[in-house]
């Protein structure tokens, strides 16, 4: 949902990963945490999706000090009665990452899902940002653990046309970034290409697809905008993501919902919407291997804490979709 480049102060690019890992392990590691079933044993390969089931994660409010950000994630996990599989992190175009958050997630058995903000594709294609991209590649490689990396999400949206340019310009920029990472020998990044769910209905999303050789996970962001947005009807999870699933499931790649959310309307409706979503994912959308809920109040109130019934429904969703043998 965030659409503007984000500016975050993170650790300097020269920070020692080994020292940070030791510090985080000593202070924040959750007892019994495990990354089983998530990545290659060496930690230098791509993110491997679960053979069965679906990973569940969220995006939590990123404001405040480090301890508050950690507490938000841990409080959610206490509510769920299980660990998150995926933690969604937004990083600005010029932000230095991976930082403490990605390292903390890896140590605690979560897959860090980094959304790297957009920049002008024309500027990228001119070579203006090659040095910055090389540095990000070097930092990701030095981290030594698998990362889901999504660059310029929702590129097909009306608010992003100025930045994305034509589909050809976007595709060229995507390939340029991908190629720089590959030439740097980065093997621990999985590329997530993510368009708007509605774009798969209109055909706009597919025009920006850079090709199977440049994408590891295919993704969509979608929301049930009613009742907050005037004129929108109440739509089910299946309705919102059906066109995405129809197109993406035929490409032989794992699918992901990078953002999804639902508002309260009548009592119990949000909970029922989440229950129906779990059933759809379990029985119909089996190629979707990760779903990430947008658990914040931004423009509308998507938070899971809007009602006890909604909170309990998401808890049930997380347990229903849990990959076998992922957790003790």
Locations of the language-model features?
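N-terminal carbohydrate-binding/catalytic regions of secreted carbohydrate-active enzymes
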Residues: 56-146, 269, 273-288, 294-301, ...
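The substrate-binding groove and active-site-proximal loops of carbohydrate-active enzymes
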Residues: 88-90, 117-127, 161-167, 230-234, ...
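Glycoside hydrolase catalytic-domain groove-lining segments
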Residues: 99-111, 115-117, 220-265
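Conserved, mostly hydrophobic/aromatic
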Residues: 87, 149, 216-218, 259, ...
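Active-site cleft segment of glycoside hydrolase catalytic domains centered on the general acid/base Glu
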Residues: 131-147, 152-217, 221-240, 268-269, ...
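N-terminal low-complexity, Pro/Thr/Ser-rich intrinsically disordered segments
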Residues: 39-55
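Aromatic-lined carbohydrate-recognition surfaces of secreted/lumenal glycan-active proteins
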Residues: 57-61, 178-203, 252-265, 290-296
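Secretory targeting and sorting signals
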Residues: 1-38
């Amino acid at each position: 949902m965030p659409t503007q480049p984000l500016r975050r102060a993170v650790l300097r690019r020269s920070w020692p990963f080994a020292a940070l890992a030791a510090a985080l392990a000593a202070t924040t590691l959750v007892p019994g945490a495990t990354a089983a079933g998530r990545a290659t044993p060496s930690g230098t390969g791509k993110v491997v999706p679960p053979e069965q089931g679906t990973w569940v994660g969220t995006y939590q409010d990123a404001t405040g000090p480090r301890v508050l950000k950690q507490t938000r994630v841990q409080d959610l996990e206490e509510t769920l009665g299980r660990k998150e599989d995926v933690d969604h992190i937004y990083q600005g175009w010029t932000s230095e990452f991976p930082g403490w958050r990605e390292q903390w997630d890896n140590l605690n058995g979560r897959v860090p899902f980094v959304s790297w903000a957009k920049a002008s594709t024309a500027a990228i294609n001119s070579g203006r940002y090659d040095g910055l991209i090389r540095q990000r590649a070097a930092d990701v490689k030095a981290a030594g653990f698998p990362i889901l990396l999504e660059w310029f999400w929702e590129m097909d949206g009306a608010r992003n046309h100025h930045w994305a340019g034509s589909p050809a310009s976007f595709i060229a920029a995507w390939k340029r970034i991908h190629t720089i990472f590959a030439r740097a020998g980065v093997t621990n990044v999985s590329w997530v290409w993510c368009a708007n769910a509605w774009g798969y209905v209109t055909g706009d999303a597919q025009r920006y697809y850079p090709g199977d050789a440049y994408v590891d996970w295919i993704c969509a962001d979608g929301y049930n905008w009613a009742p907050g947005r005037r004129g929108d009807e109440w739509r089910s999870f299946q309705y919102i993501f059906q066109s995405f699933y129809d197109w993406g499931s035929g490409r032989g790649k794992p699918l992901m919902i990078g953002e999804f959310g639902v508002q309260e309307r009548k009592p119990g409706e949000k909970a029922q919407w989440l229950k129906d979503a779990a059933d759809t994912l379990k029985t119909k959308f089996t190629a979707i291997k990760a779903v990430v809920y947008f658990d914040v109040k931004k423009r509308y109130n998507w938070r899971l804490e809007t009602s006890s019934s909604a909170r309990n429904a998401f808890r049930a969703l997380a347990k229903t979709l849990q990959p076998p043998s992922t957790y003790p």
